[in-house]
Amino acid sequence: MVSAPLLGWAAIRPIPVSRLKTCKYASNSLQSYNGIVASYLRLHYYRSLSSSAVLAEAIVHLEKTRNIGIIAHIDAGKTTTTERMLYYSGFTRRIGDVDDGSTVTDFLPAERARGITIQSAAITFHWPPLTGDGTSSSPSLEDLEAQNLPRSRASHTVNLIDTPGHADFTFEVLRSLRILDGAVCILDGVAGVEAQTEKVWHQASVYQIPRIVYVNKLDRDGAAFGRTVREVGSRLQGWPAVCQIPWFEGSNGRFTGIADVVSLQGLLWKEGGDGKSVKVFDLNGLENEDKSLAEELKRARVALVELLSEHDEDMVESFFEHEEDHLTVPSITILKSLRKCLLGPETQKIIPVFAGSSFRNMGVQPLLDAVNNLLPGPSESHDPEISLGSDKTSLGNLLSGELALQQDPKTASIEKSKQKKKAVVTRTSVDIKSLTANLESCALAFKVVSDAKRGVLVYVRVYSGSLNRNCHLYNTNLHVTERAPRLFKMYANDAVEVDSIPAGHIGVVVGLKYARTGDTLISCTGSKSVPPEPLNTLQLRPIDVPPPVFFASIEPHSLSEEKNMQEALALLLREDPSLHVTIDEDSGQTLLSGMGELHLEIARDRLVNDFKAKASMGRIEIGYRECVLDQSNPVTKIFDREVAGRKGKAGCTAVVEPYGQELESDGNDTSGSDDIIFTETVDGNKIIISAPGVNITTDKKGKEESTSLPPQLDLNSFRTSLYNGALSALARGPQFAFPMHNTKVTLTCNAAEHLFGSESSASALSAAARLATQGALRNLTTTAASTGTGMMEPVMNVIISVDEASLGAVVHDISSARGGHIVSLDEEMPISTSLSQSPESQDQPVAVDINKIYAPPDPFETPSVAGGLPIQAPANQPRTITAKVPLKEMVGYLKHLRSLSAGRGTFVMHVDRFERMSAQRQKAVLAELNR
């Protein structure tokens, strides 16, 4: 046994208990570990650290900061791994357990009752842990670089987000991914790469987040690390770089440790311990301890160096410098090469793979080292995208002064034909710097939580500057200014008040009344109101909200409870924008829409138990859509009435027609007309605004303006009013009262015919657009039944995992009884037939030859698969079915699937598209809905 120079955690002592005993409440807490006292102790400890100069220094140095998330399929071990990370970092004094409901990050009652993660939890800790007195001898990264030591020897601040795995909480994962710099993807060593894992993996690719893979649960019967590695290559579309291989011991293949391919060391954990006692063997010691493992470790090192050499020229040079000996290439060189490949422009061509068993307390510390060594800090992550008015750029370009404000792409074709319209206006560096000199901070609100004690907590990621206490934050989405009276750093459900949140960090603002998920918040020095133009339009890339597919009615127990219920719903919608609330005009019922049955059940529990709303929820139903079948005649409406005591008058002409990508590609798109000033696709509908006679020019600052509009109506509010009017009309179909889908609306507002001077207010214009669009929709239904509207239903992309014995019964049930269409049926589902075609995944797949992937042999397998030799599949090999099935047929499907598969089948699904229903099916659905 030897010391481990690459394992910084092995030489650092945990925080001493004496540190906690300074608290007067701590006398009996270490024996009974009462939950309240434990929470207080953690809070007391971090408050004491926050005052130290060391922590302040750690906050400033972004290169020692990691904003990471844990992503995975449900039950892969995300929360269990998080609890071990907190324990080894010294944040907790005992290991929380999901089954006991004692975890730190799953603190909601519903999470502890169901044993699943519902809400993403943010928590901050240090790895390796700081010493007990709040001072640290942690070396600088420059010193480590000079000594050829890894980054993991220096203590890093880790901001960790534990995300849900259930498909119903996809939005919770999406808004967490939006603010991460890196991620750890956890795989179940028995189940391998599962369907939800693929979906989350490709969602992370959209945000270009570097990821490492941790294969968990290797202690369980049936665990197959080698098979999982091959699935990483075939289903996650990247070359797996095996950085660790599992150490199986004894005749029954008992998992006892790992062999580190980078450092050529063996790590052996004490069975039944808390994971802090580790024996470390060098290669010579490992040959004496387990010769077969040592030989496999050498093969793994050869494969790793060869793989990196194909993607990194520096690794090739190092290989030749060390006499072409794979085993003598320095460990630090391999770490640098892995990091270079992971953070390079072609993100995730190489996927580092690690091994462990979090529940058995094995492999978590090396995983934390990998987070420090491989994943990027905030200063190394991709420059966030922003919009500034109608221009798209990056925040880095704005702050550096290298910014050219370009014309709006939506009106590019118009400008070509109208040479006198808006030209490209380029600001000089001096102009931009003068604008941004007073920009104090820029942050994204990625989550809103209602806390019973602290009020509304707005979680923010600061992208530039420093967000200071009592600063005035301007919301560029809502155009309101609010003061930030209190700032917190969150440790799951515990909070520490701070004076500022620096760039690159995650924190909480308390006291904001209006901020929502996805809003951009900026502050400027010396400004208490609106920032100067165009900074007041600066918006970070928003968080896309997926469309809801289920809905249920919400009714208060009495009329006196109506107000309380609406207030609770408003809080719930600020927390979770993937929920939608609408009012049925016919029945007057309040309808709550969401992503799935479990999603709505949790929302109901939150309303009743957390917000104390005295209300009940009706039966969960499916959200259908309505579509037009033909083009309507032009319908013109003039709105002429008083609004809030002021006369309003405006007009608009609307035409509605079917819309779809296939129709656009056939040349039916009319968006190239010279008079079109706005085009937007939203919720499957397309809205086009044409404004004949509205002459648009651009001033020296790049701002669009028009002298043809009334003085009280600027160009932006002119567009927005018409757009909102059309949106309002599309929210309810004329025949079945479902929201419209696959509908194109063309609005025409002629300056000479439809505008009436000072009487044409924004509200009057919006009302005219709504009336005209509604009239065009009704025009179709009154002409003829064949040219009216039809119904559309959500069709789901369903991925079912069953064993071989149940395959036939499940396929027959899907294709016959449920009217589904089988897309693929294979042991390893091709990525091209599953999630790569979903709107979330826009990354280009990497061509991976599975036969060239190195994977160590699994227990009880005779051939080594180091050279990619095939292994005969077991008789009851898990099979994957991919199908397209109407959502109506999938309601309550889990119980039926379990009866068909003897309780072993699982499935996940997401909305693939909305599809037109046949006349017979539409009639049956309407009869069921009593319409």
Curated annotation (Swiss-Prot):
**Which cellular components does GO assign to this protein?**
mitochondrion
Residues annotated as binding GTP: 72-79, 162-166, 216-219
Instruction: Answer yes or no on keyword Nucleus.
Output: no
PANTHER family in UniProt: RIBOSOME-RELEASING FACTOR 2, MITOCHONDRIAL, TRANSLATION ELONGATION FACTOR G-RELATED
Q: Does the keyword ATP-binding apply?
A: no
Q: Name one Pfam family in it.
A: EFG_C
Extra info from the record?
This protein may be expected to contain an N-terminal transit peptide but none has been predicted.
SUPFAM superfamilies for this protein: EF-G C-terminal domain-like, P-loop containing nucleoside triphosphate hydrolases, Ribosomal protein S5 domain 2-like, Translation proteins
Compartments reported by the entry: Mitochondrion
In which family does this protein belong, per the annotation?
Belongs to the TRAFAC class translation factor GTPase superfamily. Classic translation factor GTPase family. EF-G/EF-2 subfamily.
Tell me the protein's name.
Ribosome-releasing factor 2, mitochondrial
Q: Which GO terms describe its biological process?
A: mitochondrial translation; ribosome disassembly
SMART domains the UniProt entry points to: EFG_C
Q: What is the lineage of its organism?
A: Eukaryota, Fungi, Dikarya, Ascomycota, Pezizomycotina
**Briefly, what is this protein's role?**
Mitochondrial GTPase that mediates the disassembly of ribosomes from messenger RNA at the termination of mitochondrial protein biosynthesis. Not involved in the GTP-dependent ribosomal translocation step during translation elongation.
Main localisation? mitochondrion
Tell me one GO molecular function of this protein.
GTP binding
Domain tr-type G spans what residues?
Answer: 63-379
Q: What are the alphabetically sorted keywords of the record?
A: GTP-binding, Mitochondrion, Nucleotide-binding, Protein biosynthesis
Q: What domain of life?
A: Eukaryota
State the disulfide connectivity: none
